[in-house]
Amino acid sequence: MDRLKLELPRKRYISSRTAREIRERLIELVLLLAATSSIATMIAIIFTLVSESVAFFQEVSILEFLTSTQWTPLFAEAHYGILPLVSGTLVTTAVALAVAIPLGTMAAIYLSEFVTPQIREIIKPCLEMLAGIPTVVYGYFAFLFVTPLLQKILPNLPGFNMLSAGLVMGIMILPFISSISEDAMRAVPVGLREGSYAMGATKWQTAWRVVYPAAISGIFSAYILGISRAVGVTMVAAIAAGLEPKLTWNPTESAATITAYIVQVSLGDLPHGSLEYQTIFAAGLTLVLLTLGFNIAGHFLSKRYREIY
């Protein structure tokens, strides 16, 4: 009888332990499936882009694709030079970064170093709300408000132009840069700030000469995320910058970006498997490689200037 009483708790313990191990294994399996699904999705996207692009480059020379200054794949006299789309993408991105990087950095410094916690809890959510506005709303805001405003300053500015598109794209990516940069600055140890104050530095000097350099790795990551976001913006560029593929580096002119062209062609009724249809995937692969290049550069810079505390 006594032995039976001792065996019962032991069996309950073993049963409980087995059930806990099963739950842990199930959780691990779910997490593994989640991680695997994201990797599988990326592999599927790359496979689709590459397979269709290979078929495209069997008909079009890679040299022509990379060096030709005309992009007219839907015309009777077709040209397949990606440079006009790349230039439009880079110009709008450069204008966006010229707005978002200084404003986002200053906003991050203010939220991290100067504002009180109560005011931060009001300002930061309002700033992050900009990231939740649909891009089509930004596009029409650029076309119907920003462009007419700029035309009062620049009378010869056309209705479609990369300047207004880039300015609004800068506002759109501002929350990404400011929020991540602020998180990086707030992660800087308090001891660095106190040491700076002890040396007689002002709050601004501490923020700019101590905190900002110490957080530069995370801030670079914010900049790269902003670049990747700007490069991939579709509706703002399609609505405000126009759909005319043109090799120009002048932001006051109209042009087409890679994403805008993809939208333009995908809304048509091109036959599946045609050369014109395959230009979508060649342009998409170019966009992926462009974004990948920015991400690799950002990773290198972040690693190069990373501080370990």
Feature roles, as predicted:
Residues 1-35, 298-309:
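Transmembrane alpha-helical segments of polytopic membrane transport and secretion proteins
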Residues 12-30, 50-96, 116-117, 264-277:
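Periplasmic/extracellular loop-to-transmembrane helix junction in inner-membrane transport proteins
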Residues 128-173:
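Generic hydrophobic transmembrane alpha-helix motif, especially the helices
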Residues 182-186, 190, 197, 267, ...:
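C-terminal transmembrane helix and the adjacent membrane-cytosol boundary/short C-terminal tail
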Residues 103-142, 180, 308-309:
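Cytoplasmic-entry segments and transmembrane alpha-helices of multi-pass inner-membrane transporters
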Residues 180-181, 185, 197, 203-241:
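Transmembrane alpha-helices
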Residues 40, 89, 93, 97-105, ...:
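Hydrophobic positions within alpha-helical transmembrane segments of bacterial inner-membrane proteins
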Residues 152, 237-288:
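Interhelical loop and adjacent transmembrane-helix boundary motif
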